[in-house]
Every structure is written in structure tokens, then in C-alpha cells.
Curated annotation (Swiss-Prot):
Protein name: Interleukin-18
GO cellular component: a single term: cytosol
Statement: the UniProt record of this protein carries the keyword Magnesium: no
GO molecular function: cytokine activity; interleukin-18 receptor binding
Family annotation (Gene3D superfamilies): 2.80.10.50
PTMs per UniProt: The pro-IL-18 precursor is processed by CASP1, CASP4 or CASP5 to yield its mature, active form. The pro-IL-18 precursor features autoinhibitory interactions between the propeptide and the post-cleavage-site region, preventing recognition by the IL18R1 receptor. Processing by CASP1, CASP4 or CASP5 induces conformational changes to generate critical receptor-binding sites. The mature form is then secreted and released in the extracellular milieu by passing through the gasdermin-D (GSDMD) pore. In contrast, cleavage by CASP3 inactivates IL18.
Family named by the database record: Belongs to the IL-1 family.
Species for this entry: Boselaphus tragocamelus (Nilgai)
Keywords: Cytokine, Cytoplasm, Inflammatory response, Secreted
Length: 193
């Protein structure tokens, strides 16, 4: 039995150019090159909790807040407690690219535009032709903790979704992660069947 020939994945460059102190290579054939983008894959239905075991919940004002809620109450409060996490194929390798949406009366997708966390009334797009987006987060496991997750903004490097107490509410915010073991940026994600 003969071995199959492996396709050549090399790019032949025919020219180099300096533009504004940056060296660019011109490919002989760029048909197979892929531009930076995110492409939507399959969704997962999930419940998201902070480390105080409070459930992420969409309140009447369409704002993401955390509330004390036993597991038995989560299905009764669906769809405000069930989040649709769409995974995206990323043309760069930076972690699992996801959007976080909720289907209450209408589909809303989590955004961190201008570093303010809110839900935008929109379906997550099939493709995002950019390497950063206010609705794309990189879902990463916390080293040494299989069940702990962090969500880093693709638009604001080093900024993560976090839980913060404001007055009597625990809100979902975007914050720069500090190096002191900040637990406010860590969550558990429980996938639903």
C-alpha cells in the first residue's frame, strides 16, 4: 500500500515591499490565503456562574447581573438564565473564540463596546471579518482547574469579563486583569443538554 502524497502548504513569495517601515511579502498565488476573520460554528446552551455560585441572569432592563439561585430554579427562570455560546473558527490561534447570547423576547448578544458590557439586540453574525470584535471573547480554561473559565475580550487585549458588586447588585463588567490571582474574572460554565 503506497502512502498518500501530502499537499504542499507552502506560499511562494515573488516580491517584497517596504511600506511605512513595515516589510510586506507579495505572494505568487494568494487564492488559498485566508483573511483574519471569525466563522460561526455550533452553539452550546449554558448556565454561567461566578465563583460565589451566583447565576448570570438577564434582568428586566436587559442587563447581565448575578443572583443567588438554586439549580432547581434555573429551568424555571429560563430563558434569562440559559446562554447560547456560539463558538467561532478563528483564523489566528488565540483561544476558543465565542459569542454569548440570550434568547428572551428577542435575541441579544453580549458586547463590550467602549469597555462597557451590555446586551445588543442582534443575532451573532455567521462571519466577522476582523481580528477583533466587541462581541467576540476568548474562552480559556484556568490552569489547574478543569471547570474554571475566563473570557478575554478580542477587542481589548488583557481585559476580561468579571463580576463586580455595585450597590446591591453583582454586575457583569469588563476589567483589566491584575496579576494578583483576581478571582472576579473566573467563572464556571455548565452546559445544558
Amino acid at each position: 500500500m503506497a502512502a498518500e502524497q501530502v499537499e504542499d502548504n507552502c506560499i511562494s513569495f515573488v516580491e517584497m515591499k517596504f511600506i511605512n517601515n513595515t516589510l510586506y511579502f507579495v505572494a505568487e498565488n494568494d487564492e488559498d490565503l485566508e483573511s483574519d476573520h471569525f466563522g460561526k460554528l455550533e452553539p452550546k446552551l449554558s448556565i454561567i456562574r461566578n465563583l460565589n455560585d451566583q447565576v448570570l441572569f438577564i434582568n428586566q432592563g436587559n442587563q447581565p447581573v448575578f443572583e443567588d439561585m438554586p439549580d432547581s430554579d434555573c429551568p424555571d427562570n429560563a430563558p434569562q438564565t440559559i446562554f447560547i455560546i456560539y463558538m467561532y473558527k478563528d483564523s489566528l490561534t488565540r483561544g476558543l473564540a465565542v459569542t454569548i447570547s440570550v434568547q428572551c423576547k428577542k435575541m441579544s448578544t453580549l458586547s463590550c463596546e467602549n469597555k462597557i458590557v451590555s446586551f445588543k439586540e442582534m443575532n451573532p453574525p455567521d462571519n466577522i471579518d476582523n481580528e477583533g470584535s466587541d462581541i467576540i471573547f476568548f474562552q480559556r480554561s484556568v490552569p489547574g482547574h478543569d471547570d474554571k473559565i475566563q473570557f478575554e475580550s478580542s477587542l481589548y487585549k488583557g481585559y476580561f469579563l468579571a463580576c463586580k458588586k455595585e450597590n446591591d447588585l453583582f454586575k457583569l463588567i469588563l476589567k483589566k486583569q491584575d496579576d494578583n490571582g483576581d478571582k472576579s474574572v473566573t467563572f464556571t460554565v455548565q452546559n445544558q443538554h
